[in-house]
From Swiss-Prot:
The gene is prcA. GO terms for cellular component: cytoplasm; proteasome core complex, alpha-subunit complex. It holds the Pfam family Proteasome. The 20S proteasome core is composed of 14 alpha and 14 beta subunits that assemble into four stacked heptameric rings, resulting in a barrel-shaped structure. The two inner rings, each composed of seven catalytic beta subunits, are sandwiched by two outer rings, each composed of seven alpha subunits. The catalytic chamber with the active sites is on the inside of the barrel. Has a gated structure, the ends of the cylinder being occluded by the N-termini of the alpha-subunits. Is capped by the proteasome-associated ATPase, ARC. One of its GO terms (biological process) is modification-dependent protein catabolic process. This is Proteasome subunit alpha. Pathway: Protein degradation; proteasomal Pup-dependent pathway. GO terms for molecular function: threonine-type endopeptidase activity. SUPFAM superfamilies: N-terminal nucleophile aminohydrolases (Ntn hydrolases). Its main location: cytoplasm. It comes from Mycobacterium bovis (strain ATCC BAA-935 / AF2122/97). Disulfide bonds: none annotated. Belongs to the peptidase T1A family.
Length: 248
């Protein structure tokens, strides 16, 4: 006589967590950090079409690590939610905390009710409205719907520990854009070196996706930094004489 295969709820949750963590561990790393002008996003991403960083709404940005099709569905859903709420009420009613809570509820439901969890980790960031002085807000949302607000930076992807350790040592509040980019790139290199046996990889324009939420811009704060503008920032942060901030 055969017995039906039974898995306890605790074991099912453990297996789902392990599946999600393994998927995220294969992803390239993403860093989001607060700087003097807002929030900087830096991702290891050689693809120009499959983007990990995006605008969600006027003052809100999004970054993710994990399976692209899964976090892209979440990104598009977040944009639709924000547009609908901003149209029905007021644009200022759309906040980073609100969107982070929506993502947390969605991922929590998927984790507990669907056969397979999403293999994703998200960051939602918000800067103050133009003319206000409120500090940036950073929220981390994990595959099971857990949410945490981070005061300074968020690290996501496969090699978070060496990157987070590097940021803890080098992060400076109110850094310029050039300095913040240098801190983020150096931390990403520390993570890549940890997985490649100590060799320091080259992270340049072709292998980085960079964007900012610029609190000094009216209305739409999101801005991508690409091409020559990114190259100039990378050159500046490598130069000991660098004392200014480039724009792009």
């Amino acid at each position: 006589m055969s017995f039906p295969y039974f898995i306890s709820p605790e074991q099912a949750m453990r297996e789902r967590s392990e599946l999600a963590r393994k998927g995220i561990a294969r992803a390239k790393s993403v860093v989001a950090l607060a700087y003097a002008g807002g929030v900087l996003f830096v991702a290891e991403n050689p693809s120009r079409s499959l983007q990990k960083i995006s605008e969600l709404y006027d003052r809100v940005g999004f970054a993710a690590a994990g399976k692209f099709n899964e976090f892209d569905n979440l990104r598009r859903g977040g944009i639709q939610f924000a547009d609908t709420r901003g149209y029905a009420y007021d644009r200022r009613d759309v906040t980073g905390r609100q969107l982070a809570n929506v993502y947390a509820q969605t991922l929590g439901t998927i984790f507990t009710e669907q056969a397979k969890p999403y293999e994703v980790e998200l960051c939602v960031a918000e800067v103050a409205h133009y003319g206000e002085t409120k500090p940036p807000e950073l929220y981390r949302i994990t595959y099971d719907g857990s949410i945490a607000d981070e005061p300074h930076f968020v690290v996501m992807g496969g090699t978070t520990e060496p990157i987070a350790n590097a940021l803890k040592e080098s992060y400076a509040e109110n850094a310029s854009l050039t300095d913040a980019l240098g801190i983020a790139v150096a931390a990403l290199r520390a993570g890549s070196a940890d997985t490649s046996g100590g060799d320091q990889p080259t992270l340049g324009v072709a292998s980085l996706e960079v964007a900012v939420l610029d609190a000094n811009r009216p209305r739409r704060a999101f801005r991508r930094i690409t091409g020559s503008a990114l190259q100039a920032l990378l050159v500046d942060q490598e130069s000991p004489q660098s004392d200014g901030e480039s724009s792009g």
